[in-house]
Amino acid sequence: FRSDPQRDFLVDYVRTGAWGQTVSARSQWHKKTSWKRAAPTNEREKEINWRLDKNLSTGLIGEIGIHQLDAKSWFLGKRPQAITGIGSTVLWKDGRSEPDTVQINLEYEGGIHAGFDITLCNSFDTDYEMYYGTDAALMVRGSQAWMFKEADAPMLGWEVYAKKDTFFKEVGIYLVANATKLTTVTGSGEEDAKDNPYNDTPLYYALENFVHNAYVHQSGVEDFIAGFGDE
């Protein structure tokens, strides 16, 4: 996620304090799939399904959820002080030792809590992230994002002209690196997604940066220090 230009843009937006005081955050990754691969022999099946073995795998949190968890700390600008979690095998009772459903809670300084739910048993609402502040909430889905302002939130000015989408009874202000300020009210985030220059997946940008850093080593080191620090 840190390689995605759209998320880099969102971090700058978040750091301006546009959502007010941080309250909480939550995210999910839902996909109904066994996570199991077929193989011609039992021996080969065990090898290629290493993700289901707790002795070899970091499980759903480590193999998939780690990216959303990292995004939370990145956006909040904090490291968690405590983490609690629970998991169980609800559907795929096929001998695996890794759970198919996990919930965890991260506690940050100031009493801020961030929850994360991940399951292989249901696909509803797929994956997304929510961040809640005293003035607005931020929803991130893939390469798109929306801000939902509170009625008593101060005016930022540009949001009057920004494009908007309706979600049930809420109106989200469309946030994207090339179309946030001084854009027309007509249209929607979904319509503009195809024109978004940053519409590739985070994996695409991560691989692109990897190839670049393989040739320009020093800039890669500098980027890492800028993002993660030199400790």
Q: Could you say what each language-model-derived stretch is?
A:
Residues 105-110, 133:
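Active-site beta-strand termini and strand-to-loop segments that position acidic
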Residues 106, 117-118:
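Short beta-strand segments that buttress and anchor functional surface loops
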Residues 111-115, 137:
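Short, mixed charged/polar active-site loops
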Residues 63-80, 84, 94, 101, ...:
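C-terminal helical cap and adjacent loop that interface with cofactors, partners, or active-site loops
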Residues 96-99, 108:
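A short catalytic or substrate-binding loop motif that flags glycine-/basic-rich loops and adjacent residues
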Residues 1-96, 104, 128-130, 137, ...:
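Predominantly a Rossmann-like dinucleotide-binding segment in NAD(P)-dependent oxidoreductases
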Residues 100-102, 112:
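Short beta-strand or tight-loop elements
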